[in-house]
């Protein structure tokens, strides 16, 4: 990925965040890592995100990412972890697993993801505001 060139006088103080949601079943399961946005209670939602410094075009593995989900009148914060390791160095992203709880109402679950790197840069991800593509709990 190429880093964008800063405009004169413009500070690159915000991280660029992007990602997706998938099923997070154990390895070998037919639906593991399959893109999806509709989940039933008890199913594992996988959040995969990246946070990039716009100046360098690179990520800092020490960056902290947190998912903030709003449902049933409460906000649930889920910290993400760096997925990259010695056996899988190509996995340059963060992950978090959230099993849909029994008290989650059916319908859209609104969420955002925030990030902060060791240098104080921050960023926020919000999914497109299109109902058909939102994280949705189904019966």
Task: Report each predicted region and the residues it spans.
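Hydrophobic beta-strand positions in extracellular immunoglobulin-like domains
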Residues: 51, 98-100, 115
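Short, compositionally biased P/S/T/A/G/V-rich stretches that sit at domain boundaries
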Residues: 4-46, 51-54, 136-139
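Short beta-strand elements
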Residues: 121-139
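Extracellular Ig-like/FN3 beta-sandwich strand-entry sites
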Residues: 42-44, 62, 106-110
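Short, solvent-exposed loop/turn segments at the edges of extracellular beta-sandwich modules
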Residues: 55, 118-122
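Aromatic sugar-binding surface patches on proteins
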Residues: 86-98, 105-109
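Beta-strand-rich interaction surfaces with strong enrichment in secreted/lumenal proteins
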Residues: 35-37, 81-87, 99-102
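Short flexible loop/turn segments that cap and initiate beta-strands
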Residues: 51-79
